[in-house]
Amino acid sequence: MIYTSHYASPLGGMTLTSNGTALTGLYFDGERDFPHLSAAHKKDLPVFGEVMRWLDLYFAGKEPDFSPALNPTGTTFQMSVWAILQTIPFGETTTYGAIARHLEEETKKRMSAQAVGGAVGRNPISILIPCHRVIGANGSLTGYAGGLDKKEYLLELEGII
């Protein structure tokens, strides 16, 4: 069963999804990859309270010192990329190419920055899995499912730009 809740962020509304114990999605309302949730049930779950506390701290410009339970769903490759995203520290960035090189070292297989970009773009848990911290090799802000204006805001909030 899918459960939902809503969070009012400084960037607009966000929908949270959960399997009942962990966060499975965090989407800006209206973002391009927003899932169809007609079968979802609204419920007050402990994980939603934790995520909202985390987001309150984050949007106050503070680095939260705890991590709510996360359970994104994706391919093995996507999951490996998302695991790397979770290691990017607050206030820092990396590039798609750097993630590809990291995966090449781990797997001993060739990886392209474009493949990494595809996985980053399918991240179902915005902000907590910080895909906004991935930038182009030339330092440019590249795609973000919530929109480049939101990516820029998040990077400014973290003191990156």
What are the roles of these predicted feature ranges?
Residues 120, 128:
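Major-groove DNA-recognition helix of helix-turn-helix-type DNA-binding domains
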Residues 1-107, 158-161:
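Basic nucleic-acid-binding alpha-helical/helix-turn surface characteristic of O6-alkylguanine DNA
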